[in-house]
Amino acid sequence: MLRNLLALRQIGQRTISTASRRHFKNKVPEKQKLFQEDDEIPLYLKGGVADALLYRATMILTVGGTAYAIYELAVASFPKKQE
């Protein structure tokens, strides 16, 4: 059993230490230029279509959740009639 645990430990270390190193291009300066431009476009639209859809979905869920909470508070404020 100890041998199995040691083998498992070695496999875990091997996969972490010998994983291929991927070099990603630093996109931060490009994004900074994009978002710092003064072109009268709202910030939440500068990210493209995905950001616009995410913003709209967030707004719809926020407004819908607020309306639902107010509705439930209104329903809870009126006691049910007992017959």
From Swiss-Prot:
InterPro entries: COX7a (IPR039297), Cyt_c_oxidase_su7a_sf (IPR036539), Cytc_oxidase_su7a_met (IPR003177). It comes from the Eukaryota. The modification N6-acetyllysine is found at residue 33. It holds the Pfam family COX7a. It is a single-pass membrane protein. CDD domains: Cyt_c_Oxidase_VIIa. Component of the cytochrome c oxidase (complex IV, CIV), a multisubunit enzyme composed of 14 subunits. The complex is composed of a catalytic core of 3 subunits MT-CO1, MT-CO2 and MT-CO3, encoded in the mitochondrial DNA, and 11 supernumerary subunits COX4I1 (or COX4I2), COX5A, COX5B, COX6A1 (or COX6A2), COX6B1 (or COX6B2), COX6C, COX7A2 (or COX7A1), COX7B, COX7C, COX8A and NDUFA4, which are encoded in the nuclear genome. This is Cytochrome c oxidase subunit 7A2, mitochondrial. Component of the cytochrome c oxidase, the last enzyme in the mitochondrial electron transport chain which drives oxidative phosphorylation. The respiratory chain contains 3 multisubunit complexes succinate dehydrogenase (complex II, CII), ubiquinol-cytochrome c oxidoreductase (cytochrome b-c1 complex, complex III, CIII) and cytochrome c oxidase (complex IV, CIV), that cooperate to transfer electrons derived from NADH and succinate to molecular oxygen, creating an electrochemical gradient over the inner membrane that drives transmembrane transport and the ATP synthase. Residues 78-83 are mitochondrial intermembrane. It comes from Homo sapiens. Its main location: mitochondrion. GO terms for molecular function: oxidoreductase activity. Belongs to the cytochrome c oxidase VIIa family. It is found in: Mitochondrion inner membrane. Pathway: Energy metabolism; oxidative phosphorylation. One of its GO terms (biological process) is mitochondrial respirasome assembly. Residues 1-23 form a transit peptide. Keywords: Acetylation, Membrane, Mitochondrion, Mitochondrion inner membrane, Oxidoreductase, Transit peptide, Transmembrane, Transmembrane helix. The chain crosses the membrane at residues 49-77. One of its GO terms (cellular component) is mitochondrial inner membrane.
